[in-house]
Amino acid sequence: MGLPRLVCAFLLAACCCCPRVAGVPGEAEQPAPELVEVEVGSTALLKCGLSQSQGNLSHVDWFSVHKEKRTLIFRVRQGQGQSEPGEYEQRLSLQDRGATLALTQVTPQDERIFLCQGKRPRSQEYRIQLRVYKAPEEPNIQVNPLGIPVNSKEPEEVATCVGRNGYPIPQVIWYKNGRPLKEEKNRVHIQSSQTVESSGLYTLQSILKAQLVKEDKDAQFYCELNYRLPSGNHMKESREVTVPVFYPTEKVWLEVEPVGMLKEGDRVEIRCLADGNPPPHFSISKQNPSTREAEEETTNDNGVLVLEPARKEHSGRYECQGLDLDTMISLLSEPQELLVNYVSDVRVSPAAPERQEGSSLTLTCEAESSQDLEFQWLREETGQVLERGPVLQLHDLKREAGGGYRCVASVPSIPGLNRTQLVNVAIFGPPWMAFKERKVWVKENMVLNLSCEASGHPRPTISWNVNGTASEQDQDPQRVLSTLNVLVTPELLETGVECTASNDLGKNTSILFLELVNLTTLTPDSNTTTGLSTSTASPHTRANSTSTERKLPEPESRGVVIVAVIVCILVLAVLGAVLYFLYKKGKLPCRRSGKQEITLPPSRKSELVVEVKSDKLPEEMGLLQGSSGDKRAPGDQGEKYIDLRH
């Protein structure tokens, strides 16, 4: 019973297969279509693969095949093409003498099979598969701004990657620190989705979820889009991002800025740090040196204690405390010693030394510091280094030794850490004037501003011999400057002005001569002052007598001097005229050469030369030259030479 059934089944199968084996037309297996690849927006060239004989291409129909449905889109008759109404009506044209159909402005919807069918001499068809591609835009990555706690039980969202307007759908790969991530149960999960835009392009969105640890706080994540174009495979990478990772604090410590040795006056920051994220609430305390208990210091919101300017009192032991507000666990840092280096106030002894001329003086400088000190003594007026060390010895004191001396105490190992102290040395003596005499050029009825300076110890006082508005100003403890405003009158021009400086040891006087400025006044020399005030001479140019007073010369004596000068000039002029007259008459035994030969034996001509020098002053010679018009050579100083001969 079973055998007949088996035979019947075999015969039925043979009958069903016989027609295909016999080669019934239209039922043979079709070859694979030709592949044509283009990018969106470009032109696709669909070349009909039928026989190239004119007969085969003169009568061709083009179809688009979508979901196994053929739609006629183009006809070719006798080499002329005609589009059929529909979506391709405006985008098709013939090329290559009718062998190629051009499709412009390709879209993703054009990805399908196109078929060309020839009718003569017999029916043939050729299939073309059109593939369309579009590169996606640069991937956009967004990190999870809320961060990820390390104690999470499930993978948390790390970042989202979006690739827009690609075709077909690109492939996304996630990377961490340059290494690709793969799906891992309870550790890594990648969730992707795509959206079809109205243009037919795809937008891909991929979400990376992972469980992170503390070491991932600096990890770099990025995504990569892989896609294909007619030219081959390509890829685009996003920027790298770091996701906030939250982990508990395990350690708290202190940092001090600047690093290195600190000194008074610096800006010092004591910063509290922790290895947790987010950081705990910080507080900084300093140990009280008396009670040895920690006392909390005032810090800013970031747990930073600012010492500005730092002082010696800021030295001590500091600690930082961190309180985790989530777990309420408190951690304490290791104590750290802070040393603010200092130099105490400098003390000089004696503080106000007074000495007699010719005596000696020893100045001693003292100071304390947290480091080794170096001392040096400087002259205040010049800055000259007088001594390196705490002791300065001054011997055989002169008046010039009075004034300021500065002691500098410094720490060589810490640049800029130093203190100084100035001491003024007073040398007993009567007043010392800045100048003895001075000429001042003035105009009548003008107000003069005269000045007079004197120094000495005890401090001198200055008085004037004329009425006016006077004021004094201390230049230093032993030097005083007095100024006087006075109206120029004829009486003042006659008497001049005196300023007198006096102290317990004597007095001294400076004289100011007043001269009217007019058309006949000669230009003042370099030692006179044309302004209304006098200048102060340096101590090295002062000429002072300390126990005598110098009075202004009487008007009569000044007139006698002027008359004597005029008489001398007249006598010199007469003498010059007489000499010139005798010279022109030949009465003088000399020529222009200034030499006269005296006869001597030839053997002795070179033995005797008499030099005769003129006893006339240079001024007289100048008068003679001016009257005769005879200009002397620059080297001729009026000397005459006479050769003696037999």
Swiss-Prot record:
Region listing for Disordered, in residue ranges: 278-299, 525-554, 620-646
GO cellular component terms, semicolon-separated: external side of plasma membrane; extracellular region; extracellular space; focal adhesion; plasma membrane
Domain Ig-like C2-type: start-end pairs: 244-330, 335-424, 430-510
Expressing tissues: Detected in endothelial cells in vascular tissue throughout the body. May appear at the surface of neural crest cells during their embryonic migration. Appears to be limited to vascular smooth muscle in normal adult tissues. Associated with tumor progression and the development of metastasis in human malignant melanoma. Expressed most strongly on metastatic lesions and advanced primary tumors and is only rarely detected in benign melanocytic nevi and thin primary melanomas with a low probability of metastasis.
GO annotation terms (biological process): anatomical structure morphogenesis; angiogenesis; cell adhesion; glomerular filtration; positive regulation of cell migration; vascular wound healing
Membrane-related topology note: Single-pass type I membrane protein
Transmembrane feature ranges: 560-583
Biased composition (Basic and acidic residues): 629-646
Superkingdom field: Eukaryota
Signal peptide residue numbers: 1-23
Ranges for domain Ig-like V-type: 24-129, 139-242
GO MF assignments: laminin receptor activity
Residues modified by glycosylation: N56, N418, N449, N467, N508, N518, N527, N544
Subcellular location: Membrane
CDD domains according to UniProt: Ig
Residues in compartment: Extracellular: 24-559
Cytoplasmic side: 584-646
Disulphide-bonded residues: C48-C116, C161-C223, C272-C320, C365-C407, C452-C499
Record-listed Phosphoserine modification sites: S606, S614, S628
Keywords per UniProt: Cell adhesion, Disulfide bond, Glycoprotein, Immunoglobulin domain, Membrane, Phosphoprotein, Repeat, Signal, Transmembrane, Transmembrane helix
Record field: compositional bias (Polar residues): 533-547
UniProt cross-references to Pfam families, sorted A to Z: C2-set_2 (PF08205), Ig_3 (PF13927), V-set (PF07686)
Role noted for this protein: Plays a role in cell adhesion, and in cohesion of the endothelial monolayer at intercellular junctions in vascular tissue. Its expression may allow melanoma cells to interact with cellular elements of the vascular system, thereby enhancing hematogeneous tumor spread. Could be an adhesion molecule active in neural crest cells during embryonic development. Acts as a surface receptor that triggers tyrosine phosphorylation of FYN and PTK2/FAK1, and a transient increase in the intracellular calcium concentration.
Protein name, UniProt field: Cell surface glycoprotein MUC18
Organism: Homo sapiens (Human)
